Amino acid sequence: MAFLHFDNRFIRELPGDPLTLNQPRQVHAAFWSAVTPAPVPQPQLIASSAEVAALLGISLAELQQPAWVAALSGNGLLDGMSPFATCYGGHQFGNWAGQLGDGRAISLGELIHNDLRWELQLKGAGVTPYSRRGDGKAVLRSSIREFLCSEAMFHLGVPTTRALSLVLTGEQIWRDMFYDGNPQQEPGAIVCRVAPSFIRFGHFQLPAMRGESDLLNQLIDFTIDRDFPHLSAQPATVRRGVWFSEVCITTAKLMVEWTRVGFVHGVMNTDNMSILGLTIDYGPYGWVDNFDLNWTPNTTDAEGLRYCFGRQPAIARWNLERLAEALGTVMTDHAILAQGIEMFDETFAQEMAAMLAAKLGWQQWLPEDSELVNRLFDLLQQAEVDMTLFFRRLALVDVSAPDLTVLADAFYRDDLFCQHQPAFTQWLTNYSQRVLSEGVLPAERAARMNQVNPVYVLRNYLAQQVIDAAEQGNYQPIAELLEVLRQPYTEQSGKEAYAQKRPDWARHKPGCSMLSCSS
């Protein structure tokens, strides 16, 4: 086995929990607790990511060795690993929830390879002091979704945590999938997720809310030093402000990327916001099928729609304001925090305009384009048009003689296609004139559009089909779907089934259109 260089700075440099009592409790004056993953009876590695293994300097053959399977299942540790769970708080659905923490995530350590730092974290490896009423476990259903989505997002070009492995534990876990009083046993599983840092907004909020100023100052300085080393040259008087602005900028860019691919996170609580601007915590997420700004995959949010597709940027801004409030308890220059929020607004507006221009095949965004785009969004929503298919097919339109039938298979209902055909035809005419005004060659326009409009996304029903197969003991579809998702912008021969709009049977099927936080 290759030598592994672990450098566990988080637990070496930040205060830890002096108690070793591994049961749910309040933890004060500490950012982490030492924990031991719970052993599992029959660990089986059923999926892995070659790209993530390469980041860590590990081969897939090594991952399959007993020592690695033991480490990835919580049954053993490799030299240098020192498992811990972290303490943080957060706002959940707009309300302060107090201490939350890693309730079933256990970090194994920080691995250094090619001068890059990667924290390895097991999700579903047992109880920690932050588990509250949970069992610290995860089921196969949610673990497959996290594994696939982590890698799908990366290949789409969306900032994200990664997934190294998916291990079946051999356990049966009780879960009430829709919190309706009908619990069932499901297979247990563990995902090893990987990121340069798993620090969240909530890590800063909890000490601020508790008045632990020294602790908060330590975390701010540690985060800048470890995770933002390029800011070390900044004068100490402005370093924190520049850092917060960078957090605001990366968060704004993330929201634009989510919008571009039609991703809905489902539970954008402040404890689910990465300080690095990564997509983190894949729970009741979903991909937009028929375009709907009010759509949420999360049953818990079905009435309030707080975290629906169209509100994600505003929620990200709200979350940044809560982070600014926390930082403001130890940063006297509140104006510089306000500047960070302004940077979010400016960055989001600029990046959103550039992204929409790219999706529509324009070389640049013009102020008058807003009217054309808003009209398109209205039509897409009213006519129940598949977002992914529509934008991909739009590149095929001959703008010198626009024909709506090129886009017909993106519509879910023939009656709505007929009803909205005149309005769509008029929009397509206006769109074509806008494209022609730039004088771009058709092939050049199509190539540019195809770089940002994917053919393949992790549609909810595709994930559910893989889950159904895995629960019957067939794990090959996981690898097959992952292989397709590795090249989301390239038409792949024989893979047409992965590029179809949602079938009728999946419209209201649990796991395809409705999800919960149960995992």
UniProtKB/Swiss-Prot annotation:
It catalyses: L-seryl-[protein] + ATP = 3-O-(5'-adenylyl)-L-seryl-[protein] + diphosphate; L-threonyl-[protein] + ATP = 3-O-(5'-adenylyl)-L-threonyl-[protein] + diphosphate; L-tyrosyl-[protein] + ATP = O-(5'-adenylyl)-L-tyrosyl-[protein] + diphosphate; L-histidyl-[protein] + UTP = N(tele)-(5'-uridylyl)-L-histidyl-[protein] + diphosphate. One of its GO terms (molecular function) is AMPylase activity. Mg(2+) binds at N272, D281. Its EC number is 2.7.7.-, 2.7.7.108. The active site is at D271. ATP binds at G101, G103, R104, K123, D135, G136, R193, R200, D281. It comes from the Bacteria. Its cofactor is Mg(2+); Mn(2+). Keywords: ATP-binding, Magnesium, Manganese, Metal-binding, Nucleotide-binding, Nucleotidyltransferase, Transferase. It is an enzyme of class 2 (transferase). Nucleotidyltransferase involved in the post-translational modification of proteins. It can catalyze the addition of adenosine monophosphate (AMP) or uridine monophosphate (UMP) to a protein, resulting in modifications known as AMPylation and UMPylation. Belongs to the SELO family. This is Protein nucleotidyltransferase YdiU. The gene is ydiU.
